[in-house]
Each structure stands twice: as C-alpha cells, then as structure tokens.
UniProtKB/Swiss-Prot annotation:
Gene3D superfamilies: 3.30.230.10, Histidine kinase-like ATPase, C-terminal domain (3.30.565.10), MutL, C-terminal domain, dimerisation subdomain (3.30.1540.20), MutL, C-terminal domain, regulatory subdomain (3.30.1370.100)
CDD domains registered for this protein in UniProt: HATPase_MutL-MLH-PMS-like, MutL_Trans
InterPro entries according to UniProt: DNA_mismatch_repair_CS (IPR014762), DNA_mismatch_repair_MutL (IPR020667), DNA_mismatch_S5_2-like (IPR013507), HATPase_C_sf (IPR036890), MutL/Mlh/PMS (IPR002099), MutL/Mlh/Pms-like (IPR038973), MutL_C (IPR014790), MutL_C_dimsub (IPR042120)
Keywords for the protein's UniProt record, in alphabetical order: DNA damage, DNA repair
Signal peptide: none
GO molecular function: ATP binding; ATP hydrolysis activity; ATP-dependent DNA damage sensor activity; mismatched DNA binding
UniProt-recorded name of the protein: DNA mismatch repair protein MutL
Length: 649
C-alpha cells in the first residue's frame, strides 16, 4: 500500500515546470513578462542555439532587493498580488510566482540584479532548483537573468524539442507579440550574435508594426477604435488587399496581455464582412482595455486563455470598430502604386470581343493556333509618404538598404481574385489521392467540335457529329493550364529567365526562418530565392513557365503554401502548386471571349490527356446527343408509340 507524502519542493517545481516551461520560448515569455512588470523601458533578449544552450534577458526595471533574491526562487513567492481581492483585479502579466522557480528547476540559472539606491547588487546561482550561491556583486539598476543548459535534468523533454530553426521561430513569435503588446518598450532579440527583431519603444503602435511586419505592411493598415462603459478598443487592421493565408497574423491583447480567443477572431472577420477574400485573413493588432474585474486570467498556467465577462458585447464592439473604419476608406487598391508596372499592361488589355477577327474555319485545325505574346517590363520604386515619416530609424535604414545599392523591385503581396474563382477552396487533404489519379491519366480521343456561341460569359456551345456540347470555360482552361504546369514545374534545367530588375520579397522573421529550412522545395520547382538583408530574399531569375506579371503574386502564393505545409513531398508540393496556379490563372465566369479565343481553347482542351475533368474532378463539358434533343422537344416518343395510337387523332 502506497502512503501519501508531501513532495519535496524541487520535485514539485519540476512538475510545475512541465506546465509552465514547455520549450525555450516559454522561458523567454515568462522572463520578459517579469521584466515588463518591473517597469522596464528596454529589454534585450540574447539566445544561443535557439535557447537550449542559453537564454539571457537584460532589463532596466526596478530590480530585486538583496534580501528578496533568494525568496524569488521559492514557489508562489510574488510581488504582484497580496490578497484574494488582488486575484480578481490582476493588472500585471505575472502573479502566480511559479515561473522563476520552474525555470530554475530545469536549468542552470544565474540572476544578477540591483535596485536604485543600493550600495551593491546581488548575484544568485542555482542549478536544478538548488541555490548554490548568493553573493554581492556590481550591477546596474535592473535585472539580468541567464538560463543555461535548459532541460539538462529532464532528458525526456529535450527529446521532444524540434529543430533549432523551429524553436527559434517560436521565440521570435513570442517577442513579436510582446513588442506589439507594449510599443512603449524597446525590445531587441539577438540569436547567436545576430539581431532578429528590434522595436523602437516610442509608444507608437504603427512603428512597432513596421519594425515587425515591415514598412509596406504598416502603411497598409488602418486605425480602429471603439468604446463603451466597459471596454476600450484600439489598434490597427490591414486593408482587405493585404491578407495572409492563416490567422497567425491576428494579435489580440487584453490589458497588454496576448491572448487567444476564437470568438474575438470571429468578430474580427465579421467586421470585414464580404470584403475579405475566401480563405484569406487580415493582419490585425487589437488592444482591448478592460476593467480587470471583468477578465479572469487565472485559468491556465500559460495565461493565454482568458475568460471575459460580457463577451458578446465585446465582440460587437470589435466588429463595429473594424466595419466603421473600413467604411471611411477607399477600398479600391491604389492604382498609383502600380502605375509604372501597369502602364504597358493596361494599354494592351483590350476587350477581346471587339478585335476584328477573320475566322471562317468551321472546325479547328490540327495545328495549334498562334497565340499573341505580351512583354511587360515595369519598375517599381518604394517611396516614403508623409504617413511614413514618423516610422522608426530601423525601418528607414532597411528601406535605404533596399533602394540605394541597385535598382530593385520591392515585391508586394497582391490579393488573388478569390471572389471570382469558380473553385476558391482547395481540399489539400485529398491532394495525394488526386495527384496519383491525375498522373495515371492517358490521352483519350476527343470529338471534333464546332464552336458557335457563348452564354453568360461562362459557357461555350459547340456541336459535334453526335450532338451538342456545353463547355465550362473556366474548368476547360483550368485543365489546360494544369497539364501545362504539371509538365513545366520542376523542370529546372534550361528553364530560367534572368530578370532585368530583381525582386525583393520580405517576410516576418519567423516565416523567413522556416522558409530557409524549406528552400530546397522551392528550388525543386525552379524558384531560387537568395537571402538579401534581414528577413528578405532576392529573386534574380524566374522559371520560364511563370509570366513576369505573375512573379510577385506567384512567389508569395508558393511561399504561403510552403509555410502552411509542414511536411510535404516534392511530388505533393508540385501537385498542389500546379492545381493552385491553374485555378487562379484561368479565365473566370462572366468573362466574354471572342470566337478565335474560344476555338483556341477547344483546340488546347483536345490536346489534354484528360479533357473531361478539371483538376478538382468537376466536369469540363456535358454532351446532349441528337436523340436527347429530340426527346426533349417530343420529336420522338421513347416507346415509339404514334399519336394516332394514343388516340390524339
């Protein structure tokens, strides 16, 4: 029979560490939150080997008094709350008194601190939760905490750590969120001697956004605000033209604390209404100030889950704040920004229905019709507008570095026309099966068709020897382009075209790290991005199958797909990419095409291995036989009974 015993404090701390300290990013979060609670205006985070070897946090806060340093490593010892009433009005990020002892129990911890007016500072060294020394030391006002050999005494936890790049990505995400939560604090993240993130700490949220997400993104975000007796909402959301493929760029803060809340995320999307494209999500940084009595943060040790009173009222306020701000904006994308790019393109884009065509051939020839080619060369220069004059020196220096040395395209994320897509959603879960099926397709006979009309700018009508054919023009071109892309994607040899003016692509630091890990997948499909500055990549050549006007949107789409796909084979990646690009690059519904283009499309469809289904499996064309038509018009009776026999005469 086992007996009930009280666990030793060190063992209890290690158990608590299992909930509080999941990975190096947890250490960074807890220590930085302590620094924020200490009133710091500058916080420096230094890490080595993604935090597994070393995490060091230096702040200029209040510090810890000499006689309280050792007490800080005891469980549930805190300066944040004093009594039960304080627990229901928490105004600090920390309050449990678990973080520091939990960290100390699974690492070698060195703490150096001093308070204002003290004759000396204090140095504490603890190993595995056991304090080894506490001695006077020289230190500036503030605290420096150094955590080394994390999880050295819990090897099971080490076993489940991901790659260094993945762990570093989590740390960058934590620091970015804290920087957005507290724009009044200067944050600097240094990994293995290289600065990854820096915010100015001026108190201006737009500047913090520019330092983290980039200058271009910051300029495309609009301010929101709303309030009632219980809540005060402020922040920035992106214009509908600036979106991402997932919700990771939505940051919600309650009283300076980053939280995750599904209902508030839903309220943000509701605020955009139908202005957002299908499957796309905005960038949002929203601060909610609330009476602490209405928010319960004592739910989970990580404190990311918060229970909110009057949550429905808050959701309404958030939605209204976004909707009202969007009403004040001109949501047509700024044509002036892309004027240089689109001058040639706009001049050449003429409604095809007015072209003088002399096409008298009833049936298409068995040689591919000539297709007109367009060359589009455009220069794009980034300019600092008046709105951007107050941005951080860091952001300006980055911009100068991009524009001065050479003439470059600074790529922007362009929204795809998801609202016009006939198939806006891709079921990526079925890609493997679909790809295997598509690869097994063999060339099949296709009837000779005579095109004679179009309906609603969507369906083509053609007749063959055995009846009427109705063709979905989007599905038809999607099938044609899919087979083109399927053959060309990945054909790297002799398929590159040099760019006269290279393109620069910018990503947040955590996305840039993950892209570096998965860059070989891009190279397999002929896209070669080279590092260029902080969190930026340069493209000097592009696959021959990618039109120059599609470079910006195409590369960003490929990178978004790559970031969303954690484990992907080359085969699956190429299939996803071919399906995605064929869908987005095909003519849409309600788009009239001339007779020549229609005949050309039918010819291209006839050359496909499988002309009967689009890559999603939907039918490309339907067939009515002559007999079917006669039955519909009652020209023949199915049982061949005469009208006289039916008694009609």
């Amino acid at each position: 029979m086992s007996h009930i015993i009280e666990l030793p404090e060190m063992l209890a701390n290690q158990i608590a560490a299992g909930e509080v300290i999941e990975r190096p990013a947890s250490v960074v979060k807890e220590l930085v939150e302590n620094a924020i609670d200490a009133g710091s205006s500058q916080i420096i985070i230094e890490i080595e080997e993604a935090g597994l070897k070393k995490v060091q946090i230096t702040d200029n806060g209040h510090g810890i008094a000499h006689d309280e340093v050792e007490l800080a490593l005891r469980r549930h010892a805190t300066s944040k709350i004093k009594n039960q009433a304080d627990l229901f009005r928490i105004r600090t990020l920390g309050f449990r008194g678990e973080a520091l002892p939990s960290i100390a129990s699974v690492s070698v911890l060195t703490l150096l601190t001093a308070v204002d007016g003290a004759s000396h500072g204090t140095k504490l060294v603890a190993r595995g939760g056991e304090v080894e020394e506490v001695i006077p030391a020289t230190s500036p006002v503030g605290t420096k905490v150094c955590v080394e050999d994390l999880f050295f005494n819990t090897p099971a936890r080490l076993k489940y750590m991901k790659s260094q790049q993945a762990e570093l990505s989590h740390i960058i995400d934590i620091v970015n969120r804290l920087g957005l939560a507290h724009p009044e604090i200067s944050f600097s993240l240094i990994s293995d001697g290289k600065e990854m993130t820096r915010t100015a700490g001026t108190g201006q949220l737009r500047q913090a956004i520019a330092g983290i997400y980039g200058l271009v993104s910051a300029k495309k975000m609009i301010e929101i605000e709303n309030s009632d007796l219980d809540f005060e909402i402020s922040g920035f959301v992106s214009l509908p033209e600036l979106t991402r493929a997932n919700r990771n760029y939505i940051s919600l803060f309650i009283n300076g604390r980053y939280i995750k809340n599904f209902l508030l995320n839903r309220a943000i999307l509701d605020g955009f209404g139908s202005k957002l494209m299908v499957g796309r999500f905005p960038l949002a940084v929203i601060h909610i100030h609330i009476d602490p009595y209405l928010a319960d943060v004592n739910v989970h040790p990580t404190k990311q889950e918060v229970r909110i009173s009057k949550e429905k009222e808050l959701m309404t306020l958030v939605s209204e704040a976004i909707a009202n701000s969007l009403k004040e904006q001109t949501l047509i994308p700024d044509a002036l920004e892309n004027l240089a790019k689109s001058t040639v393109r706009n001049r050449e884009k003429v409604d095809q229905t007015i072209l003088p065509l002399k096409e008298n051939t009833l049936y298409y020839e068995k040689t591919e019709p000539s297709r007109p080619s367009q060359t589009e060369v455009a220069d794009y220069q980034v300019e600092l507008t008046d709105e951007g004059q107050d941005l951080t020196l860091f952001a300006k220096e980055t911009l100068d570095r991009l524009t001065k040395p050479a003439k470059l395209h600074f790529a922007e994320r362009k929204p795809a026309n998801y609202d016009q897509l006939d198939h806006p959603e891709l079921d990526l879960a079925s890609i493997d099966k679909a790809y295997d099926k598509l690869e097994r397709e063999e060339a099949s006979s296709f009837p000779e068709l005579e095109f004679f009309g179009q309906m609603h700018g969507t369906y083509l009508f053609a007749q063959g020897r055995d009846g009427l054919y109705i063709i979905d023009q989007h599905a038809a071109q999607e099938r044609v382009k899919y087979e083109e892309y399927r053959e060309s994607i990945g054909n790297v040899d002799q398929s590159q075209q040099q760019l006269l003016v290279p393109y620069i692509f910018e990503f947040p630091a955590d996305d840039a790290l993950r892209l570096k890990e998965r860059m070989p997948l891009l190279e397999e499909v002929g896209v070669f991005l080279a590092e260029y500055g902080e969190n930026q990549f340069i493209l000097r050549e592009h696959p021959i199958w990618m039109a120059e006007e599609e470079i910006e949107s195409g590369i960003y789409e490929m990178c978004d797909m790559l970031l969303l796909t954690k484990e992907v084979s080359i085969k699956k990646y190429r299939a996803e990419l071919a399906i995605m690009m064929s869908c987005k690059r095909s003519i849409k519904a309600n788009h009239r095409i001339d007779d020549h283009s229609a005949r050309q499309l039918l010819y291209q469809l006839s050359q496909c291995d499988n002309p009967y289904n689009c890559p999603h499996g939907r039918p490309v064309l339907v067939h009515f036989t002559k007999s079917d038509m006669e039955k519909m018009f009652r020209r023949i009776q199915e049982n061949h009974t005469s009208l006289r026999e039916l008694g009609k005469y």
